Amino acid sequence: MLDQSTHIRHLAVVPLSLLVLVLASAQVRSEPTRRLITQAIDESKRVELPGNTHPEANTENDRGMVPDSFPMEHMQLQLRLPMEKEDELDNLLQKIQDPSSPNYHKWLTPEEFKQQFSLASEDIETITNWLKSEGFTVNVINARSVDFWGTAGQVRSAFRTAIHYFDVRGVRHIANLSNPQIPAALAPAVAGIVSMNDFKPHPIGGVR
């Protein structure tokens, strides 16, 4: 099973500015990213992406499925890097914040960051081709995610999870009822999915 909290830890704890403009001097060299997807996609072999449901998207609040035509915009497939690249990024982030480091506050441009800390291009192509084959439109490919959109029917077919209406404290929401699934061949390169629901995070001490 995939551990989403581990593999997207940088997205959760590192300021966006540091992920977009990460430390590097002109002399830093990075090895090409190792491919993670090594098997052909077999739709009969699936794995679940745990931790990808909202706690209030439960049977008590369930009000039934949305129409298949319901638009699902700006979903994001979160990508994972090989462990050696994660370690390299950890090291760079430590140096950028260390005043004693000769690389203190030396930055990569967004394009350089994408080149150094993205999946192998072959893996990204495999993932985006699979999304397109399921009828989705790919909007943006970032270093750590693929932004895409489609319909609730396409989500149910591709990810084996249905999008339902949920009434929570007088407000209607939409969300996936169960954890999504992906072909097992893609699992080494995928950490999770964001934005399959419209629940907004509450501030600390706010309503939960």
What are these regions (language model features)?
Residues 13-23:
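Bacterial N-terminal signal peptides
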Residues 2-15:
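Bacterial N-terminal signal peptides that target proteins for export
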Residues 27-208:
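Non-catalytic regulatory appendages
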